[in-house]
Amino acid sequence: MNQPANQFNPSSSQPVDPTVLNLTDSAAQKVRRLREEEGDSNLMLRVYVTGGGCSGFSYGFNFANELNEDDANFDNNDVTLVVDSLSYQYLQGSTVDYTEGLEGARFIVTNPNATTTCGCGSSFSI
């Protein structure tokens, strides 16, 4: 299921590819900085969905050193996003961004499949 990701530019009028997991420039820059801090330029950002949160599902992020058998990976801006097959069905066409604001610094997901999201943006329902 390895597919190249399209570069996402939030100010662009180009459509986001609905079959991949997209990454903003801001998120890619943050991942590259975190990889430098860890001293491992091969780390991949794993994005996953778990049950929980105020809307039913929650997003999670961690670093991965290797791919699992059921993983899809998407390369964008010198960063590889990894998602397992179960989470992929909920995340198709989503965009991962990184923001810094009053709520703190965090990765957020804009998910076109979500019918509702919580106010903090970390949980959703389908």
Swiss-Prot record:
Residue span of region Disordered: 1-21
GO BP annotation list: iron-sulfur cluster assembly
GO molecular function: 2 iron, 2 sulfur cluster binding; 4 iron, 4 sulfur cluster binding; iron ion binding
Cofactor needs: iron-sulfur cluster
Disulfides per UniProt: none
Cofactor note: Binds 1 iron-sulfur cluster per subunit.
Pfam families found in the cross-reference section: Fe-S_biosyn
PROSITE patterns in the record: HESB
Binding-site residues for iron-sulfur cluster, renumbered to this chain: 54, 118, 120
Keywords on record: Iron, Iron-sulfur, Metal-binding
Source superkingdom: Bacteria
HAMAP family attached to this UniProt entry: Fe_S_insert_ErpA
Function: Required for insertion of 4Fe-4S clusters for at least IspG.
Similarity field: Belongs to the HesB/IscA family.
Quaternary structure and interacting proteins, as annotated: Homodimer.
Protein name, entry field: Iron-sulfur cluster insertion protein ErpA
Organism: Psychrobacter arcticus (strain DSM 17307 / VKM B-2377 / 273-4)
Lineage: Bacteria, Pseudomonadati, Pseudomonadota, Gammaproteobacteria, Moraxellales
Gene name of the record: erpA
